[in-house]
Amino acid sequence: MKILAGICDASAFLGTIGALNEIVHTSNDLDDLKQWAGSNYTGEQKYIAKQAVRDKNVITANGTAPMEFAKEILIALNVAAEEKILDWYNFHKLGFYTAPMPQM
């Protein structure tokens, strides 16, 4: 499976090529995305204010969401069982002293 992914201003670049017009997506900010992407971006109704979004084979995230972005990519690529990926994510997001050590 091929995926297309963009985080931070790379998600805005996806808007400039029209890749976000038909899918649910996010970016740093809707106004910022519209300014960067210009007239090629017509997907405003599909924008949601969320750390990371996966719709079909396209993954987008804002610049403060590298963990969420990585999690969505790993799930999309099916590199491990989703439960294992979520364990990894929770361990790194919540920290060594809060989350249990993931069992890979």
Model-found features: residue ranges?
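Active-site-adjacent pocket-lining segments in enzyme domains
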Residues: 1-5, 9-104
